[in-house]
Structure formats: structure tokens, C-alpha cells
């Protein structure tokens, strides 16, 4: 607060993949040295609707003293929140093609589901049965679902007939070099060795749902988010 008004503190964006930039770790984890004075800290949680839940905290920095301020991120119990990012132009290879294509090319504009499956693993089988049980609901939603396998070998072991009712909106593909799984795991801070992984995201690269491993009622969880979009 200076000369009767609050002035924005600016920080170099840097290269986040090189450990620099305006990340929580670099800016806040270990604290920062600030000039003495009166400050306002504003945080925001972005919702899928585009609205932002904001919170303002006011505090004073005194000379030679450490000031601890809680970082408050508001949450909504009723509205879908943006929880991460996913590059919708990430590519995979459809099982009926020799050419790679992007998620965006497959799904078009709007929301979509991307999953990386572990063939023959009970968590994946359970998830697919949950989705098949609500196949009609996913059909009515009408958006694309891209289900990926870590390799061609794993895909050949997959038998969709074991999961009667899976929606026709599913496109199957190969996650070449595990690139999509790696991106999701890194962006959402997940365990790289656990499958399946499911996300709901959109072509603005916003993730609004993520699930990894064994999950009870995955189909219902997905549809709850879908109905909130």
C-alpha cells in the first residue's frame, strides 16, 4: 500500500520447467523478503464456468519481524472447479491408423474424457464396468472419450466385449512413448506407476476432474462433473 493505493508486485515468469518462474514453490514455500508496510494478498480459484472465487487477506510487514499469513484458496461445493492443465493438442495414435493425431482433432471443441488404461488390471476393469453401466448417460452427453493403451501389445489383449454397454463415443488409441500419461502425471502430481488415469478436460486446456487407480463409482463421479459443466 503506497501513496493511497495498492500497487501490484511483479515477478519474472521465467522458465517453470527449469525450476524458475512464478510457482508456489518459488514464491511462497520458503517465504519472501518484503519491504515494511501494509499489504493485500489476493488468491483465486477458477471455476469451469469462468467465474473466480477470490479471497483477500490484509497484513502488515514490520521491520525485523517474520509475518506468517495463511494462504486461503476458496472452494465451491456446488460448482466444478479447474484443478489443472492438459494440452489438448497432445498426440496419440488411433488403433485404426498409422498416423498420430491430437486429442483436439479427435474431440473437437469443448469437454472430453481422456484415460490411460492398464489392460487386465482390476482397477481398470472396475472403472470400465462403472462406465459401461452408465453408457446411455455418456451417449446422451455426446462428448468424445479417448481411451489409451500404453502399447500396441496391451491393446491387443483388450476385449471390449467383456464390458457390455461402453458408449460408442469412445475412441481407442496408443499412448506413444507414454507421452500423454507423463503429461497428466506431471501436471496433476500423480504417481507414474498407477493405472488407470482418467481426466475430464476441455480444449482451453483446463482439467476439471482427475482420478487414478482403484475408484468406487467412477462412472457416477464422471457424470456428476459432466452435469455440473
Report the location of each language-model feature:
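A short beta-strand-turn-helix
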Residues: 86-112, 120, 129-133
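Structural microenvironment flanking redox-active thiols in thiol-disulfide oxidoreductases
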Residues: 120-167, 178-185
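Short hydrophobic alpha-helix segments
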Residues: 10-12, 56, 209-211
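Structured interaction patches on ligand/partner-binding surfaces of diverse proteins
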Residues: 44-74
Amino acid at each position: 500500500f503506497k501513496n493511497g493505493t495498492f500497487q501490484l508486485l511483479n515477478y519474472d515468469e521465467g522458465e517453470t520447467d527449469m525450476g524458475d518462474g512464478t510457482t508456489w514453490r518459488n514464491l511462497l514455500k520458503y517465504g519472501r523478503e518484503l519491504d515494511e508496510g501494509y499489504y493485500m494478498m489476493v488468491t483465486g480459484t477458477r471455476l469451469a464456468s469462468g467465474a473466480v472465487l477470490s479471497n483477500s487477506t490484509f497484513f502488515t510487514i514490520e521491520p525485523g519481524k517474520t509475518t506468517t499469513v495463511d494462504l486461503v484458496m476458496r472452494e465451491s461445493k456446488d460448482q466444478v472447479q479447474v484443478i489443472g492443465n492438459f494440452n489438448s493438442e497432445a498426440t496419440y495414435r488411433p488403433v485404426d491408423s498409422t498416423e498420430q493425431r491430437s486429442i483436439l482433432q479427435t474431440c473437437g471443441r469443448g469437454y472430453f474424457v481422456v484415460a490411460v488404461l492398464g489392460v487386465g488390471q482390476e482397477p481398470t476393469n472396475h472403472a470400465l464396468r462403472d462406465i459401461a453401466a452408465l453408457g446411455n448417460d455418456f451417449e446422451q452427453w455426446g462428448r468424445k472419450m479417448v481411451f489409451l493403451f500404453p502399447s500396441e501389445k496391451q491393446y491387443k489383449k483388450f476385449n471390449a466385449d467383456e464390458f457390455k454397454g461402453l458408449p460408442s463415443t469412445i475412441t481407442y488409441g496408443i499412448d506413444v512413448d507414454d507421452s500423454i500419461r507423463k503429461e497428466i502425471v506431471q501436471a496433476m502430481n500423480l504417481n507414474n506407476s498407477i493405472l488407470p488415469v482418467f481426466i475430464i478436460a476441455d480444449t482451453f486446456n483446463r482439467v476439471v476432474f482427475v482420478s487414478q487407480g482403484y475408484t468406487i463409482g467412477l462412472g457416477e463421479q464422471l457424470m456428476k462433473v459432466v452435469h455440473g459443466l
